């Protein structure tokens, strides 16, 4: 099919350039209900995304683009019609002209596959989760997915790259059945490789968290507190913090920060070093065909680099570093045990963290947390916290302990000092 698509694109004289993304996914899926296997399924899909570029205007000063998907085999006439429709739509888009990424022949990257059968792997992971259950806390449902995905991109400038990667996704719903009511949580986990010791820890935490949810009470008489974030919330914090430093953000003037400007002023805590990296060696290129290599965005609390797509890099006159999926940050000097030695709020479930550099705001709505008053750990819920982002960054504490997941490498926890509790 990909040859047919490329031939049809080349046949249309109004197509100034093109990009084809072919994604083949082989997914092994297992569904468990009340800790018993219900259904197994194997799904194989092959999908194409075709982006058509059309230069127009005086001296071809503008380039428009339009994308369409192909999920089934099309006749030559159907494909030609889709391309013509995309060209028509692209005529109405007036982006500043830019060049597609240039390539030089085929290149392929591939992660080594697991030797065990995917269903055996998923059963082992599920049974490790179920082993953490107690008489009153168990997993009402668990869905397990093993996906091996091959992505190939070709463009009109000679790019022809292919990468094959695998991952395991788990969606677990732990529940706690108490004498008064039943409560549930939803927990998502992604693994690059099979590490049953890590799975065992994740399962134990999920069961402990749902028990905390059952016992949680309204937080009262705590107007201010240090807040500890962990897990996905740390990743979200870092992504929010550097989100405006993309080429796109700089071009659209979403930030006024220049290279060398301080992100943290008057640092009293840990200086931040944040960047983007590859999830694996096979994660070698981005959606445009830009070759990826680790890049630093913030170093020692200062902005040292932008990042982002080929298009907006050209608008800024910069060499593109690409669009990444995995963020990384340097660890701090403080152990988690030391972080937790003083009174604090440890966030277990957060609806999302919000950061606005220009209004100076940081905050979030908390669904579940643990309040440590210096003596007792008390599960609490139904509140929010907020504070000044500049002050929070100045006093920021990063844990010495780190995690390395698919989308995040860095400190396991961070501590935000003196947040207002609402």
Q: How should each PLM-predicted stretch be described?
A:
Residues 2-7, 15-28, 76-163, 201-235:
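Acidic low-complexity segments
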Residues 9-10, 37-41, 128-133, 156-164, ...:
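A generic local secondary-structure boundary/capping motif
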Residues 16-49, 141-161, 287-288, 343-366:
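Structured beta-strand/loop patches that form or line metal/cofactor-binding pockets in enzymes
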Residues 23, 31, 124-201, 248-275:
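Extended amphipathic alpha-helical scaffolds
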Residues 27-88:
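N-terminal alpha-helical targeting/anchoring segments
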Residues 44-58, 161-191, 297-299, 366-373:
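Short beta-strand elements
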Residues 61-72, 103-119, 171-175, 181-200:
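Short His/Asp/Glu-rich catalytic/ion-coordination signatures at enzyme active sites or charged loops
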Residues 259-422:
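Dual-mode signal for accessory low-complexity, basic/Gly-rich regions
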């Amino acid at each position: 099919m990909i040859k047919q698509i490329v031939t049809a694109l080349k046949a249309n004289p109004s197509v100034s350039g093109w990009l084809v993304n072919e994604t083949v996914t082989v997914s092994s899926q297992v569904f468990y209900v009340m800790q018993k296997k219900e259904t197994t399924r194997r799904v194989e899909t092959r999908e194409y995304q075709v982006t058509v570029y059309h230069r127009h205007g005086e001296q071809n000063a503008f380039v428009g683009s339009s994308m369409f998907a192909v999920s089934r085999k099309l006749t030559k006439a159907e494909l030609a019609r889709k391309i013509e429709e995309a060209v028509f739509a692209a005529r109405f888009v007036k982006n500043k002209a830019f060049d597609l990424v240039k390539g030089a022949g085929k290149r392929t990257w591939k992660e080594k596959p697991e030797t065990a059968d995917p269903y055996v792997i998923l059963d082992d992971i599920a049974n490790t989760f179920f082993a953490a259950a107690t008489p009153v806390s168990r997993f009402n449902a668990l869905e397990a997915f093993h996906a091996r995905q091959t992505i190939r991109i070709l463009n009109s400038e000679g790019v022809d790259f292919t990468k094959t990667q695998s991952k395991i996704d788990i969606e677990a719903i732990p529940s706690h059945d108490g004498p008064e009511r039943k409560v549930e949580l939803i927990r998502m986990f992604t693994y690059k490789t099979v590490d049953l010791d890590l799975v065992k820890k994740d399962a134990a935490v999920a069961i402990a968290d749902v028990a905390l949810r059952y016992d949680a009470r309204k937080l009262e008489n705590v107007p201010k507190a240090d807040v500890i974030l962990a897990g996905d919330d740390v990743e979200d914090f870092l992504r929010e913090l550097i989100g405006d430093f993309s080429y796109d953000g700089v071009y659209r003037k979403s930030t006024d920060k220049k290279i060398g400007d301080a992100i943290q002023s008057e640092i009293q805590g840990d200086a931040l070093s944040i960047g983007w990296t590859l999830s694996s060696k096979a994660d070698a290129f981005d959606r445009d065909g830009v070759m990826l290599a680790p890049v630093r965005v913030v170093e020692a609390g200062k902005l040292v680099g932008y990042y982002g797509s080929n298009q907006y890099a050209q608008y800024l006159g910069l060499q593109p570093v690409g669009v990444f999926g995995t963020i990384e940050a340097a660890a701090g000097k403080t152990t988690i045990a030391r972080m937790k030695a003083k009174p604090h709020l440890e966030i277990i479930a957060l609806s999302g963290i919000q950061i606005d550099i220009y209004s100076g705001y940081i905050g979030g709505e908390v669904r579940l947390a643990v309040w440590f008053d210096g003596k007792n750990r008390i599960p609490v819920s139904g509140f929010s916290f907020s504070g000044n982002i500049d002050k929070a960054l100045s006093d920021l504490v990063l844990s010495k302990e780190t995690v390395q997941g698919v989308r995040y490498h860095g400190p396991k926890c961070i501590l935000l000092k003196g947040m207002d509790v609402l």
